[in-house]
Amino acid sequence: MKFSFTKNREGQKGFSILEMMLATVILLVGLVAIAQLVPASILLNYRNRTDSSALVFAQRELDQMLDQPLNAPGSPPQFTDALANICYLGDPASPNTVQGSPVVVINNQALIDFTAATVANFSFLYLDLTDPSGVTYDVRWAVIITGNGSSISAKRFILGVRQQGGNGYFQPVTLDTMVER
């Protein structure tokens, strides 16, 4: 006859110290990782705001240029923008050439060359009074007139805006558009 001895063991309750230490380490690693993401997200949010400000300003300035007639009066054709800057619109006597700020082509995209010196009446500095850090934007543009000298059929505007000052480095914003009859 076989006797089986069974001993009633009480079930374990709670966690061992090793399990608690492992859980604590995992929790701390997660908290440190999240803590590092907060400053990075704040910086990216600031940069996105700055890029958006430059783009909105570039769009407003380009809209004012596009609102001018193709055969604008004056020699050379010009207008005064909403910020009281005199803006040249290109000389019809020099068709099919880049007039104004120098342009470079990178990856088949025409961009304003901000390494070159500014060209009078084809550039200005804009101080953003709504920005508490006092950011200044360097605004430059080039115009390419298509026509035969006396008759203008189209104008291509390449406008670039670059932030000067502030925290960090920001790529310039470039808008390229054409208006024709």
Question: Each predicted region: which residue ranges?
Answer:
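Low-complexity, Gly/Pro-rich coil/beta segments used as flexible assembly/activation regions
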Residues: 49-52, 56-181
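N-terminal leader/signal peptides at the extreme start of proteins
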Residues: 1-15
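Detector for methionine-enriched segments
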Residues: 1, 20-21, 65, 178
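Aliphatic-rich helix starts adjacent to a transmembrane/signal segment
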Residues: 15-59
